[in-house]
Amino acid sequence: MTKLTQQDAWAQLEAQAAKLPHMRELFEADPQRFDKMSLSACGLLLDYSKNRADEQTLEQLFKLAKSAGLSDKIHAMFDGEIINNTEKRAVLHTALRAEADEVILVDGQNIVPEVKQTQAKMAKFVEAVTSGEWKGYTGKAITDIVSIGIGGSFLGPKIVTQALRPYWNPALKCHFVANVDATSLCEKLRLVDPETTLFVMSSKSFGTQETLTNTLSAKAWFLKNGGTQVDIAKHFVAVTSNVAKATEFGMDADNIFPMWDWVGGRYSLWSAIGLPIALLIGMDNFYQLLAGAKSMDKHFVEAPLEQNMPVIMGLFSLLYGNFYQAQSHVVLTYDHYLRGLPAYFQQLDMESNGKSVTLNGDNVDHATGPVIWGGEGTNGQHAYHQLLHQGTALIPADFILPLQSHNPLGEHHVQLASNCFGQTQALMQGRTFDEALAELDGSSQSQEEKALIAKHKVMEGNKPSNTLLMDKLTPETLGALIALYEHRTFVQGAIWDINSFDQWGVELGKTLGNDVLARLQSDEEAKALDASSNALINLFRRGHL
């Protein structure tokens, strides 16, 4: 296969990037631009008209996708082929959203029945806890869930429960612990009562350093505050593949939920890793979350590339990284409940596409994954939006807004929407020198002063953005939104021909961290590592500067 950067479409896109008119001109030339460059699917509307693209750009982007075999790669993932080539694994988080009558094979076995059995087990457990049938060791009902995990087993459930706050069971609270920093755990334990607290420990191996350390400390706290070893089973459950270690810990085998190798951590919220979500919002709403993601799966598989929402978003991100040297991408959520999504999408994209070799091990000769960052509108407008408007770096943006608020109050939501739409317009349109100068008419300043100030008020514009709308934030629309970004991430990795489903950089950090831990716990002065690491270890062991 011809290298990506040697494809004709690549050369065409390079040429077009240098000569494409300003977006102001593109909108002036085509009053129907929004109608032509917007798309509705799965309860979401994507407005991609404020991107640096004309019909030729789109044509070449789709040509590039086709030359990379994108459609075949999409089907390969959904069919359970081994697309994670370094770990020899299928990638089937989509199977967690499958219908009961679907057949999805892994090693010749249909995995859908096992998925459905696990969901049924989750439903039974959720009902027991939320109904009050499940009691703590003193006979009291559960009031607090403490979810202990790290990475995908922490961030996904945390962000989803945060986003779906209006759907919470009022009788339950959920607290999330990930960092091995003791402060994280201790602050949560101060909020809960051992008699009414349920700990959900999520670790595939039951040996992840941070998760195991936090779980052992939680167990010690529980035993210190009235619980006994026999009571552990009433207050600790696990999501793990290592049943033996979980039962040795004191958990009942009936309350251990499975994990599978064909689900990566950052794609795992749809599995039993989502147990804290289900406990808080109820199993019916959890099923709606899955249904929303399933609808996006269906759209991704069936829609032509030219009308495919994840494909379009992935291609535009690729366009800016590879042809405009954009090194970051900002996600701006105009809904307080969605304030955590940028961090979730950050992990999803950067852990997936932060790669520098192709599937065959060749060094890539182009940029891959950008830095993903962002925050909550309108807060960001009074902070980092300044850089978006007048900084020297091109930073594409995604704006996300529900049309209806869960908390309608006066003019709040219409003001929120006006800021969202106004920002996308300002980024696209900018302000010319003449426009800035005209705004100063009537002031008492000299012409020289006006000219100087006008130069500082100029904004180039032509800054690209997508706008994503939904009627209202619900479990179903949230599921579709998260699946959209999952598939958008896949599209980029598939075209770049990289493995979006391993994370060897993360693994190296774990290995070296364990090595350093052994040296920190040793009585001997650190000498074997580099001079900097040795000095830092010795300073830490001394306990002061």
From Swiss-Prot:
Functional pathway: Carbohydrate biosynthesis; gluconeogenesis; Carbohydrate degradation; glycolysis; D-glyceraldehyde 3-phosphate and glycerone phosphate from D-glucose: step 2/4
Family annotation (PROSITE patterns): P_GLUCOSE_ISOMERASE_1, P_GLUCOSE_ISOMERASE_2, P_GLUCOSE_ISOMERASE_3
UniProt keyword terms in alphabetical order: Cytoplasm, Gluconeogenesis, Glycolysis, Isomerase
Enzyme class of the recorded protein, top EC level: isomerase
Primary localisation category: cytoplasm
Compartment list: Cytoplasm
Listed SUPFAM superfamilies: SIS domain
Biological process annotations from GO: gluconeogenesis; glucose 6-phosphate metabolic process; glycolytic process
Catalytic reaction list: alpha-D-glucose 6-phosphate = beta-D-fructose 6-phosphate
GO MF terms, alphabetically ordered: carbohydrate derivative binding; glucose-6-phosphate isomerase activity; monosaccharide binding
Residues forming coiled coils: none
InterPro entries for this protein: G6P_Isomerase, G6P_Isomerase_C, Phosphoglucose_isomerase_CS, SIS_dom_sf, SIS_PGI_1, SIS_PGI_2
Active site residues per record: E351 (proton donor), H382, K510
EC number(s) stated in the UniProt entry for this protein: 5.3.1.9
Protein function: Catalyzes the reversible isomerization of glucose-6-phosphate to fructose-6-phosphate.
UniProt similarity note: Belongs to the GPI family.
Protein name: Glucose-6-phosphate isomerase
Organism listed in the record: Shewanella loihica (strain ATCC BAA-1088 / PV-4)
Gene name as annotated: pgi
